[in-house]
Amino acid sequence: MNGSPTPKRYSSKSSRLYDDYYNIPYQYSNPTPMNRDYNDVGSRINADKLVPEEYKRNTEFINKAVQQNKELNFKLREKQNEIFELKKIAETLRSKLEKYVDITKKLEDQNLNLQIKISDLEKKLSDANSTFKEMRFPKVKDPMVDDDPVSENYDQINVPKHRAPDATGNPRTTNKVSNTSDQDSRLKAIERTLSVLTNYVMRSEDGNNDRMSPLPSPLNTILPINNRLNFQEPKRYNPTVKVNPSDDDIMMYESAELKRVEEEIEELKRKILVRKKHDLRKLSLNNQLQELQSMMDGDDNIKLDNVSKHNHATHRHSSQSSRDYSPSSDACLECSNDLYEKNRVKPENNMSETFATPTPNNR
Protein backbone atom coordinates (compact mmCIF):
# COMPACT_ATOMS: atom_id res chain seq x y z
CA MET A 1 0.00 0.00 0.00
CA ASN A 2 1.25 3.40 -0.95
CA GLY A 3 2.29 5.21 2.24
CA SER A 4 2.48 8.62 0.65
CA PRO A 5 0.11 11.28 2.03
CA THR A 6 -0.86 12.14 -1.55
CA PRO A 7 -1.13 8.75 -3.35
CA LYS A 8 -2.93 10.06 -6.46
CA ARG A 9 0.04 12.21 -7.32
CA TYR A 10 2.16 9.10 -8.03
CA SER A 11 -0.44 7.04 -9.93
CA SER A 12 -1.14 7.62 -13.63
CA LYS A 13 -4.07 6.55 -15.72
CA SER A 14 -1.87 5.08 -18.44
CA SER A 15 -0.54 2.37 -16.14
CA ARG A 16 -3.78 0.76 -15.09
CA LEU A 17 -2.64 -2.77 -15.89
CA TYR A 18 0.39 -2.35 -13.66
CA ASP A 19 -1.30 -0.78 -10.63
CA ASP A 20 -0.63 -2.06 -7.19
CA TYR A 21 -2.69 -4.98 -5.90
CA TYR A 22 -3.94 -2.91 -3.05
CA ASN A 23 -5.29 -0.16 -5.25
CA ILE A 24 -8.97 -0.12 -4.33
CA PRO A 25 -10.68 1.02 -7.59
CA TYR A 26 -9.25 -1.94 -9.60
CA GLN A 27 -9.05 -4.57 -6.92
CA TYR A 28 -12.34 -6.36 -7.77
CA SER A 29 -12.85 -5.32 -11.42
CA ASN A 30 -11.12 -6.28 -14.71
CA PRO A 31 -9.55 -3.39 -16.63
CA THR A 32 -10.56 -2.82 -20.23
CA PRO A 33 -8.28 -4.73 -22.64
CA MET A 34 -5.86 -2.76 -24.82
CA ASN A 35 -6.77 -4.66 -28.03
CA ARG A 36 -10.26 -3.55 -29.00
CA ASP A 37 -10.73 -6.37 -31.55
CA TYR A 38 -11.29 -8.90 -28.77
CA ASN A 39 -14.00 -8.83 -26.15
CA ASP A 40 -13.73 -9.82 -22.53
CA VAL A 41 -14.33 -13.49 -23.23
CA GLY A 42 -11.54 -13.58 -25.84
CA SER A 43 -13.59 -14.05 -28.99
CA ARG A 44 -12.91 -11.78 -31.99
CA ILE A 45 -15.32 -8.93 -32.54
CA ASN A 46 -16.76 -8.84 -36.11
CA ALA A 47 -15.86 -5.27 -37.04
CA ASP A 48 -17.03 -5.71 -40.68
CA LYS A 49 -20.60 -5.51 -39.58
CA LEU A 50 -19.99 -2.10 -38.18
CA VAL A 51 -18.44 -0.72 -41.42
CA PRO A 52 -21.03 0.23 -44.07
CA GLU A 53 -20.91 -1.25 -47.58
CA GLU A 54 -20.22 2.08 -49.27
CA TYR A 55 -16.99 2.49 -47.36
CA LYS A 56 -15.94 -1.02 -48.34
CA ARG A 57 -16.62 -0.35 -52.01
CA ASN A 58 -14.79 2.94 -51.86
CA THR A 59 -11.72 1.30 -50.30
CA GLU A 60 -11.74 -1.48 -52.89
CA PHE A 61 -12.04 1.04 -55.71
CA ILE A 62 -9.24 3.15 -54.25
CA ASN A 63 -6.98 0.09 -53.85
CA LYS A 64 -7.61 -0.94 -57.46
CA ALA A 65 -6.91 2.59 -58.65
CA VAL A 66 -3.66 2.70 -56.69
CA GLN A 67 -2.59 -0.67 -58.14
CA GLN A 68 -3.43 0.44 -61.66
CA ASN A 69 -1.52 3.66 -61.10
CA LYS A 70 1.56 1.70 -60.03
CA GLU A 71 1.34 -0.54 -63.09
CA LEU A 72 0.91 2.42 -65.40
CA ASN A 73 3.87 4.19 -63.83
CA PHE A 74 6.00 1.09 -64.34
CA LYS A 75 4.95 0.83 -67.99
CA LEU A 76 5.58 4.54 -68.46
CA ARG A 77 9.13 4.17 -67.14
CA GLU A 78 9.76 1.27 -69.51
CA LYS A 79 8.47 3.27 -72.46
CA GLN A 80 10.61 6.24 -71.47
CA ASN A 81 13.69 4.01 -71.33
CA GLU A 82 12.86 2.60 -74.77
CA ILE A 83 12.42 6.11 -76.17
CA PHE A 84 15.76 7.14 -74.66
CA GLU A 85 17.53 4.15 -76.22
CA LEU A 86 15.90 4.82 -79.59
CA LYS A 87 17.00 8.45 -79.44
CA LYS A 88 20.57 7.37 -78.79
CA ILE A 89 20.46 4.95 -81.72
CA ALA A 90 18.96 7.65 -83.94
CA GLU A 91 21.74 10.09 -82.99
CA THR A 92 24.43 7.54 -83.80
CA LEU A 93 22.77 6.69 -87.10
CA ARG A 94 22.45 10.38 -87.96
CA SER A 95 26.14 10.96 -87.28
CA LYS A 96 27.03 7.92 -89.39
CA LEU A 97 24.77 9.14 -92.18
CA GLU A 98 26.47 12.54 -92.17
CA LYS A 99 29.86 10.89 -92.25
CA TYR A 100 28.88 8.64 -95.15
CA VAL A 101 27.41 11.59 -97.05
CA ASP A 102 30.74 13.40 -96.69
CA ILE A 103 32.60 10.29 -97.83
CA THR A 104 30.35 9.91 -100.88
CA LYS A 105 30.90 13.57 -101.79
CA LYS A 106 34.65 13.14 -101.54
CA LEU A 107 34.52 9.96 -103.62
CA GLU A 108 32.40 11.68 -106.26
CA ASP A 109 34.90 14.53 -106.45
CA GLN A 110 37.76 12.06 -106.75
CA ASN A 111 35.89 10.14 -109.44
CA LEU A 112 35.28 13.36 -111.37
CA ASN A 113 38.95 14.33 -111.13
CA LEU A 114 39.99 10.88 -112.28
CA GLN A 115 37.62 11.03 -115.23
CA ILE A 116 39.09 14.40 -116.21
CA LYS A 117 42.60 12.98 -115.94
CA ILE A 118 41.59 9.94 -118.01
CA SER A 119 40.11 12.13 -120.73
CA ASP A 120 43.28 14.26 -120.80
CA LEU A 121 45.45 11.17 -121.00
CA GLU A 122 43.33 9.70 -123.78
CA LYS A 123 43.59 12.97 -125.72
CA LYS A 124 47.37 13.01 -125.26
CA LEU A 125 47.51 9.37 -126.32
CA SER A 126 45.52 9.99 -129.47
CA ASP A 127 47.72 13.00 -130.32
CA ALA A 128 50.85 10.92 -129.80
CA ASN A 129 49.49 8.12 -131.98
CA SER A 130 48.61 10.57 -134.74
CA THR A 131 52.06 12.18 -134.62
CA PHE A 132 53.70 8.77 -134.68
CA LYS A 133 51.64 7.71 -137.68
CA GLU A 134 52.52 10.92 -139.47
CA MET A 135 56.19 10.36 -138.74
CA ARG A 136 56.06 6.71 -139.73
CA PHE A 137 53.81 6.98 -142.78
CA PRO A 138 54.06 10.49 -144.25
CA LYS A 139 51.72 11.45 -147.07
CA VAL A 140 53.23 10.83 -150.46
CA LYS A 141 52.65 13.81 -152.69
CA ASP A 142 51.31 13.12 -156.17
CA PRO A 143 53.56 14.12 -159.03
CA MET A 144 53.10 17.53 -160.51
CA VAL A 145 50.30 17.37 -163.04
CA ASP A 146 49.16 20.30 -165.04
CA ASP A 147 45.68 21.36 -164.18
CA ASP A 148 45.04 22.62 -167.68
CA PRO A 149 46.57 20.03 -169.87
CA VAL A 150 47.44 21.17 -173.32
CA SER A 151 45.10 19.77 -175.88
CA GLU A 152 47.02 17.42 -178.03
CA ASN A 153 46.99 18.67 -181.58
CA TYR A 154 49.04 16.26 -183.46
CA ASP A 155 48.66 18.36 -186.56
CA GLN A 156 50.50 21.28 -184.93
CA ILE A 157 53.33 19.19 -183.37
CA ASN A 158 56.35 18.64 -185.48
CA VAL A 159 57.54 15.16 -184.67
CA PRO A 160 60.89 14.27 -186.18
CA LYS A 161 60.92 11.14 -188.20
CA HIS A 162 64.33 9.95 -187.06
CA ARG A 163 64.75 10.16 -183.23
CA ALA A 164 67.76 9.25 -181.26
CA PRO A 165 67.45 6.12 -179.16
CA ASP A 166 68.14 8.06 -175.92
CA ALA A 167 65.44 10.58 -176.62
CA THR A 168 62.63 8.07 -176.69
CA GLY A 169 61.96 8.43 -172.90
CA ASN A 170 58.98 10.36 -171.62
CA PRO A 171 59.96 13.35 -169.41
CA ARG A 172 56.95 12.80 -167.13
CA THR A 173 58.02 9.24 -166.27
CA THR A 174 61.51 10.43 -165.47
CA ASN A 175 60.05 13.04 -163.15
CA LYS A 176 57.97 10.38 -161.37
CA VAL A 177 60.98 8.11 -160.86
CA SER A 178 63.04 10.93 -159.41
CA ASN A 179 60.22 11.94 -157.06
CA THR A 180 59.79 8.36 -155.73
CA SER A 181 63.52 7.99 -155.17
CA ASP A 182 63.59 11.24 -153.18
CA GLN A 183 60.64 10.09 -151.08
CA ASP A 184 62.29 6.74 -150.37
CA SER A 185 65.46 8.44 -149.25
CA ARG A 186 63.47 10.75 -146.97
CA LEU A 187 61.58 7.81 -145.50
CA LYS A 188 64.81 5.97 -144.81
CA ALA A 189 66.29 9.03 -143.13
CA ILE A 190 63.16 9.44 -140.98
CA GLU A 191 63.27 5.76 -139.99
CA ARG A 192 66.92 6.05 -139.05
CA THR A 193 66.30 9.10 -136.85
CA LEU A 194 63.29 7.39 -135.30
CA SER A 195 65.29 4.28 -134.44
CA VAL A 196 68.03 6.44 -132.90
CA LEU A 197 65.48 8.32 -130.83
CA THR A 198 63.79 5.13 -129.61
CA ASN A 199 67.15 3.61 -128.62
CA TYR A 200 68.08 6.77 -126.73
CA VAL A 201 64.75 6.82 -124.91
CA MET A 202 65.05 3.14 -123.98
CA ARG A 203 68.54 3.71 -122.58
CA SER A 204 67.37 6.69 -120.57
CA GLU A 205 64.48 4.61 -119.23
CA ASP A 206 66.86 1.86 -118.16
CA GLY A 207 69.05 4.44 -116.44
CA ASN A 208 66.25 6.30 -114.72
CA ASN A 209 62.73 4.89 -114.42
CA ASP A 210 61.35 8.22 -113.33
CA ARG A 211 61.78 9.82 -116.73
CA MET A 212 59.21 9.97 -119.46
CA SER A 213 58.15 6.83 -121.30
CA PRO A 214 59.45 6.23 -124.84
CA LEU A 215 57.64 7.47 -127.88
CA PRO A 216 54.25 5.82 -128.12
CA SER A 217 53.94 2.97 -130.53
CA PRO A 218 50.88 0.98 -131.55
CA LEU A 219 52.05 -1.87 -129.31
CA ASN A 220 52.50 0.01 -126.06
CA THR A 221 49.40 2.16 -126.57
CA ILE A 222 47.18 -0.88 -126.11
CA LEU A 223 48.07 -1.11 -122.40
CA PRO A 224 45.13 -0.40 -120.10
CA ILE A 225 44.85 3.03 -118.60
CA ASN A 226 44.29 1.62 -115.10
CA ASN A 227 47.87 0.32 -115.00
CA ARG A 228 49.21 3.76 -115.90
CA LEU A 229 47.17 5.45 -113.20
CA ASN A 230 48.39 2.88 -110.62
CA PHE A 231 44.94 1.73 -109.59
CA GLN A 232 44.92 -1.04 -107.00
CA GLU A 233 41.99 -3.21 -106.11
CA PRO A 234 41.12 -3.41 -102.41
CA LYS A 235 42.46 -6.55 -100.79
CA ARG A 236 40.05 -6.65 -97.86
CA TYR A 237 36.30 -6.76 -98.01
CA ASN A 238 34.96 -3.23 -97.94
CA PRO A 239 31.17 -2.83 -98.08
CA THR A 240 31.48 0.89 -98.78
CA VAL A 241 32.64 0.01 -102.29
CA LYS A 242 29.19 -1.34 -103.03
CA VAL A 243 26.61 0.85 -104.69
CA ASN A 244 24.00 0.45 -101.95
CA PRO A 245 25.56 -1.19 -98.86
CA SER A 246 23.25 -2.10 -96.04
CA ASP A 247 23.59 -0.77 -92.49
CA ASP A 248 24.47 -4.23 -91.20
CA ASP A 249 27.34 -4.53 -93.65
CA ILE A 250 28.67 -1.12 -92.69
CA MET A 251 28.43 -1.83 -88.96
CA MET A 252 30.10 -5.23 -89.37
CA TYR A 253 32.89 -3.64 -91.39
CA GLU A 254 33.41 -0.91 -88.79
CA SER A 255 33.43 -3.41 -85.92
CA ALA A 256 35.99 -5.53 -87.78
CA GLU A 257 38.15 -2.47 -88.38
CA LEU A 258 37.93 -1.48 -84.71
CA LYS A 259 38.82 -5.01 -83.64
CA ARG A 260 41.81 -5.03 -85.97
CA VAL A 261 43.02 -1.68 -84.64
CA GLU A 262 42.58 -2.88 -81.03
CA GLU A 263 44.61 -6.00 -81.79
CA GLU A 264 47.37 -3.89 -83.31
CA ILE A 265 47.37 -1.61 -80.25
CA GLU A 266 47.55 -4.61 -77.90
CA GLU A 267 50.42 -6.05 -79.92
CA LEU A 268 52.31 -2.76 -79.75
CA LYS A 269 51.67 -2.49 -76.01
CA ARG A 270 52.99 -6.01 -75.52
CA LYS A 271 56.11 -5.24 -77.53
CA ILE A 272 56.71 -2.02 -75.59
CA LEU A 273 56.29 -3.88 -72.28
CA VAL A 274 58.74 -6.58 -73.35
CA ARG A 275 61.21 -3.93 -74.46
CA LYS A 276 60.91 -2.13 -71.11
CA LYS A 277 61.46 -5.40 -69.26
CA HIS A 278 64.54 -6.10 -71.34
CA ASP A 279 65.89 -2.59 -70.68
CA LEU A 280 65.34 -2.96 -66.94
CA ARG A 281 66.98 -6.38 -66.98
CA LYS A 282 69.92 -4.99 -68.94
CA LEU A 283 70.33 -2.12 -66.47
CA SER A 284 70.23 -4.48 -63.49
CA LEU A 285 72.78 -6.81 -65.09
CA ASN A 286 75.07 -3.89 -65.93
CA ASN A 287 74.87 -2.64 -62.34
CA GLN A 288 75.59 -6.13 -61.04
CA LEU A 289 78.56 -6.45 -63.39
CA GLN A 290 79.97 -3.11 -62.26
CA GLU A 291 79.60 -4.13 -58.61
CA LEU A 292 81.39 -7.42 -59.23
CA GLN A 293 84.18 -5.66 -61.13
CA SER A 294 84.61 -3.14 -58.34
CA MET A 295 84.71 -5.98 -55.79
CA MET A 296 87.36 -7.83 -57.81
CA ASP A 297 89.45 -4.66 -58.19
CA GLY A 298 89.22 -4.11 -54.43
CA ASP A 299 90.31 -7.72 -53.66
CA ASP A 300 93.31 -7.42 -56.00
CA ASN A 301 94.41 -4.21 -54.28
CA ILE A 302 94.09 -5.85 -50.84
CA LYS A 303 96.19 -8.86 -51.94
CA LEU A 304 98.93 -6.64 -53.35
CA ASP A 305 99.04 -4.62 -50.13
CA ASN A 306 99.29 -7.81 -48.03
CA VAL A 307 102.11 -9.22 -50.18
CA SER A 308 104.08 -6.00 -49.99
CA LYS A 309 103.64 -5.76 -46.18
CA HIS A 310 104.35 -9.46 -45.48
CA ASN A 311 107.42 -10.12 -43.26
CA HIS A 312 108.59 -13.72 -43.31
CA ALA A 313 110.93 -13.24 -40.36
CA THR A 314 108.10 -12.45 -37.95
CA HIS A 315 105.53 -14.63 -39.68
CA ARG A 316 104.06 -17.42 -37.54
CA HIS A 317 101.56 -20.00 -38.73
CA SER A 318 99.27 -22.12 -36.64
CA SER A 319 100.43 -25.21 -38.52
CA GLN A 320 104.15 -24.37 -38.27
CA SER A 321 105.61 -27.47 -36.63
CA SER A 322 108.30 -30.02 -37.30
CA ARG A 323 105.89 -32.34 -39.04
CA ASP A 324 103.71 -29.90 -41.04
CA TYR A 325 105.76 -28.45 -43.83
CA SER A 326 103.82 -29.70 -46.78
CA PRO A 327 102.82 -27.29 -49.54
CA SER A 328 99.16 -27.92 -48.72
CA SER A 329 99.44 -26.40 -45.24
CA ASP A 330 98.23 -22.97 -44.25
CA ALA A 331 101.72 -21.47 -44.42
CA CYS A 332 102.71 -19.37 -47.38
CA LEU A 333 105.10 -20.79 -49.96
CA GLU A 334 108.31 -19.15 -48.68
CA CYS A 335 107.59 -20.00 -45.04
CA SER A 336 106.84 -23.62 -45.91
CA ASN A 337 110.10 -23.90 -47.90
CA ASP A 338 112.10 -22.46 -45.00
CA LEU A 339 110.45 -24.85 -42.59
CA TYR A 340 111.19 -27.78 -44.88
CA GLU A 341 114.89 -26.86 -45.12
CA LYS A 342 115.21 -26.51 -41.33
CA ASN A 343 113.55 -29.81 -40.50
CA ARG A 344 115.23 -31.80 -43.25
CA VAL A 345 117.66 -34.28 -41.50
CA LYS A 346 119.60 -37.24 -42.75
CA PRO A 347 117.88 -40.59 -42.29
CA GLU A 348 120.84 -42.11 -40.31
CA ASN A 349 120.78 -39.47 -37.64
CA ASN A 350 117.07 -39.66 -37.46
CA MET A 351 117.11 -43.42 -36.93
CA SER A 352 119.82 -43.22 -34.24
CA GLU A 353 117.86 -40.66 -32.40
CA THR A 354 114.78 -42.78 -32.46
CA PHE A 355 116.51 -45.92 -31.04
CA ALA A 356 118.70 -44.09 -28.47
CA THR A 357 118.00 -44.69 -24.77
CA PRO A 358 117.00 -41.63 -22.89
CA THR A 359 119.60 -40.39 -20.39
CA PRO A 360 118.38 -39.04 -17.11
CA ASN A 361 118.96 -35.43 -16.30
CA ASN A 362 121.80 -34.55 -13.95
CA ARG A 363 120.51 -33.62 -10.57
UniProtKB/Swiss-Prot annotation:
Keywords: Coiled coil, Cytoplasm, Cytoskeleton, Nucleus, Phosphoprotein. The modification Phosphoserine is found at S213, S217, S284, S329. One of its GO terms (cellular component) is central plaque of spindle pole body. One of its GO terms (biological process) is regulation of microtubule nucleation. Residues 319-329 have a biased composition (Low complexity). It is found in: Nucleus; Cytoplasm, Cytoskeleton, Microtubule organizing center, Spindle pole body. Residues 170-182, 349-363 have a biased composition (Polar residues). Forms a polymeric layer at the periphery of the spindle pole body (SPB) central plaque which has an essential function during SPB duplication and may facilitate attachment of the SPB to the nuclear membrane. Belongs to the SPC42 family. This is Spindle pole body component SPC42. The lineage of its organism: Eukaryota, Fungi, Dikarya, Ascomycota, Saccharomycotina.
